[in-house]
Amino acid sequence: MRIALGLQYDGSPYAGWQTQLHQPTIQDELEKALTAFIGEEAKAFPVHTITAGRTDTGVHALGQVVHFDTNVGREDFSWVRGVNTFLPKSIVVNWAKEVPEEFSARFSAYERTYIYALHAGPCRSPIVNARAGYLMLPPDQFLDVEAMKKSAECLIGEHDFSSFRSSECQSKTPVKTIYAIDIISQEPWVYFRIRGNAFLHHMIRNIVGCFLQIGQGRQQSGWMAEVLTAKNRQIAAPTFMADGLYLAKIKYPEEFAIPQPWLENAWLPTNVIGK
């Protein structure tokens, strides 16, 4: 049978989602917990998880979805309670659900939402250390939010996002579709919410880096379109820090009845998380 899980995690202690040699990863922690909960049966049927989004080092998740195959039957909440018993405090399973064999956490997803939380001001906040990005600004200055919003317009739709693509990206194509970008200002915070069908490696962080160049007045709002058209990573801004990036939501066809993520326990404002 195939089981889907909904996860939340603090990505700061980990070298990303995917298993890596001699590095702590979320996939390893989850598979160890699943193996411990399943018990002896896991020896004959090892656990291997497939995820909707392979988050990078330091990136967090509010609504990650994974699936795995098993020959062990459990009630849905038994998976939640049992697996959480073996997980570190930085990772939690919010829900579990048996799904049909044709469901894939990765390939069945048709929309993903990321949120980037940025604190901008003269002093960083130790309270949200590793939970938010930080940009040092003088006390009497703030980002030009309207200029950033204007620059975002050119990114909506289907485009070749090569200028925002990491050299390590394994995607077969740089062409992706962005459905919406919302920039929400609540000084000293700015939140970037981006919805799309899929994203390239470092794509969100590279876009945020460009937004901040424009928000600080170092580039005009029209510069974003120039970067997009160039299809050249060297033209864009440096990759911004991972700390403030959250995989917030993933959407699937209604036929799979995948639960919505539990966002009420996230520290982000309600108007940022959205519906």
UniProtKB/Swiss-Prot annotation:
GO terms for biological process: tRNA pseudouridine synthesis. GO terms for molecular function: RNA binding; tRNA pseudouridine(38-40) synthase activity. The keyword tRNA-binding does not apply. Substrate binds at residue 114. Keywords: Isomerase, tRNA processing. The keyword Transmembrane helix does not apply. It catalyses: uridine(38/39/40) in tRNA = pseudouridine(38/39/40) in tRNA. It comes from the Bacteria. InterPro entries: PsdUridine_synth_cat_dom_sf, PsdUridine_synth_TruA, PsdUridine_synth_TruA_a/b_dom, PsdUridine_synth_TruA_C, TruA/RsuA/RluB/E/F_N. The active site is at residue 56. Its EC number is 5.4.99.12. It holds the Pfam family PseudoU_synth_1. Belongs to the tRNA pseudouridine synthase TruA family. Formation of pseudouridine at positions 38, 39 and 40 in the anticodon stem and loop of transfer RNAs. Homodimer. This is tRNA pseudouridine synthase A. The gene is truA.
